[in-house]
UniProtKB/Swiss-Prot annotation:
[4Fe-4S] cluster 1 binds at C53, C56, C59, C93. The gene is porD. One of its GO terms (molecular function) is 4 iron, 4 sulfur cluster binding. Heterotetramer of one alpha, one beta, one delta and one gamma chain. [4Fe-4S] cluster 2 binds at C63, C83, C86, C89. This is Pyruvate synthase subunit PorD. Binds 2 [4Fe-4S] clusters. Gene3D superfamilies: 3.30.70.20. Residues 44-73, 74-103 form the 4Fe-4S ferredoxin-type domain. InterPro entries: 4Fe4S_Fe-S-bd, 4Fe4S_Fe_S_CS, PorD_KorD, Pyruvate_synthase_PorD. It holds the Pfam family Fer4_21. Its cofactor is [4Fe-4S] cluster.
Amino acid sequence: MAESPFKADIERAQKELTEKMTPGAIAYIPGSSVINKTGSWRVFKPEFHKDKCVRCFLCYIYCPEPAIYLDEEGYPVFDYDYCKGCGICANECPTKAIEMVREVK
């Protein structure tokens, strides 16, 4: 899977903020999972049904992490290395083209 186009920007911003802030339990950058793979502790994962998708991009827009990309045709592609399995994409999908299924490892 291709590397996130946002990764370099997030890493640079994180470095700048880290130098200026005192250490603590703060989420000071949204979309930090692109730097830290979080897919290994997911319980549910999104399963995509292309035949139901109307390419509204709501899943892409609402994903709190940059874990959804759009392919050349405008369909979502899920990067399971960074998907936390929160289900926001499935909840926002108006046609139920995304279903949350139990992760099997």
